[in-house]
């Protein structure tokens, strides 16, 4: 909608074209939903491309202003940029010009864009839809910078809003600003219920506990780790954990549910043995022969690998951890993720995601490995 909280996002540029470049560069299919259907006759009449050029040359700060004023303002400051454009709209009233809509507010164009996106195969699709912040709020808030601070509308603005969107609430109830809910047997409600059932149920829905139960290994499985060494030699906590993890991975029930996650630090923690034991997950398998293939603990990638190797990407590692740690709720399938990171690169890089994980009731293990001394 061109606006952030304080002002336009790219007042001197064009955010849609900027985002288009980002997505196309990443290999996405991009659908731009910029102009509504009322522009179609004008674009069809634009034989010399003048209208298209003015559209392209106008920056977002100008587009915000057009929808914060009225039809006369648009006539003077948009179509007024070229005499032939003024000729083009000479027979249109200011109201007609004001009715020229943005693509994101045209139901037909929105449908066409979504239909095209749903039929596209081979690449993900993004729809960049142009809309107006505060759409329908009229002079109180439409396309205005303080729109997000607007806490309430006066009665005239509420009436204007009701009329604008044809909400069936009588005048004598407007002061209470009641919610409108269609009747249960209305086409709208029937459609909403049908869609929710087709999609697997109602939202929001939170599964507190998975329906399945996993048997925890008995303590004597970890005897080799818990018993003191014959020489009374101390071992590092990192080494102890690696031994515990190895035992858990061997368990027939819990083992397949374990998700070890590392961010380019496996060798740092002495965990490279897992490369050979469980493999590094990659959807397409290993398409090359690793340089250390002749070694016992070589870098083995596999389509059925279990270890997630995220590279130097703590945010990615934590995101994978959250996905596995909330699987009991979202997928009704318990997973046991272990995210092991270099201690000094831990919460410093993923603090916000830890907070989010707590809000989501994520269940798993975060381990700060070597302290870096």
Indicate where each model-derived feature is located.
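Thiamine diphosphate
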Residues: 84-104, 108-112, 177-373
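Long, well-ordered, tryptophan-enriched scaffold segments
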Residues: 2-228
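Generic beta-strand/beta-sheet core signal
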Residues: 1, 31-33, 128-132, 136-140, ...
């Amino acid at each position: 909608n061109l606006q952030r909280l304080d002002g336009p996002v790219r007042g001197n540029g064009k955010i849609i074209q900027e985002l288009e470049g980002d997505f196309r560069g990443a290999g996405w299919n991009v659908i731009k939903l910029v102009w509504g259907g009322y522009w179609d006759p004008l674009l069809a009449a634009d034989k010399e491309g003048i209208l298209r050029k003015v559209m392209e040359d106008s920056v977002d700060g100008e587009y915000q202003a057009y929808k914060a004023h009225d039809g006369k303002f648009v006539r003077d400051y948009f179509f007024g940029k070229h005499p032939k454009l003024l000729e083009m709209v000479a027979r249109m009233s200011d109201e007609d010009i004001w009715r020229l809509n943005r693509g994101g507010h045209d139901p037909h164009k929105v449908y066409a864009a979504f239909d095209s996106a749903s039929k596209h195969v081979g690449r993900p699709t993004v729809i960049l839809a142009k809309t107006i912040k505060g759409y329908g709020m009229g002079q109180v808030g439409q396309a205005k910078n303080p729109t997000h601070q607007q806490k309430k509308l006066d009665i005239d603005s509420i009436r204007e809003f009701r009329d604008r969107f044809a909400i069936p609430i009588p005048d004598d109830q407007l002061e209470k600003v009641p919610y409108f809910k269609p009747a249960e047997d209305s086409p709208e409600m029937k459609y909403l219920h049908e869609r929710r059932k087709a999609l697997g149920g109602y939202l929001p829905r939170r599964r507190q506990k998975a329906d399945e139960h996993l048997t925890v290994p008995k303590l004597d499985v970890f005897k080799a780790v818990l018993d003191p060494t014959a020489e009374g030699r101390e071992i590092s906590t990192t080494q102890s954990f690696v031994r515990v993890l190895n035992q858990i991975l061997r368990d027939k029930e819990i083992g397949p549910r374990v998700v070890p996650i590392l961010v380019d630090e496996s060798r740092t923690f002495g965990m490279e043995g897992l490369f050979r034991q469980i493999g590094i997950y990659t959807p397409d398998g290993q398409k090359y022969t690793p340089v250390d293939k002749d070694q016992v603990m070589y870098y083995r990638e596999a389509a059925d690998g279990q270890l997630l190797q995220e590279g130097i990407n703590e945010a990615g590692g934590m995101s994978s951890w959250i996905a596995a740690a909330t699987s009991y709720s979202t997928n009704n399938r318990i997973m046991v993720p272990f995210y092991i990171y270099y201690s000094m690169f831990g919460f410093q890089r993923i603090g916000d995601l830890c907070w989010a994980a707590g809000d989501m009731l994520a269940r798993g293990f975060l381990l700060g490995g070597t302290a870096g001394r």
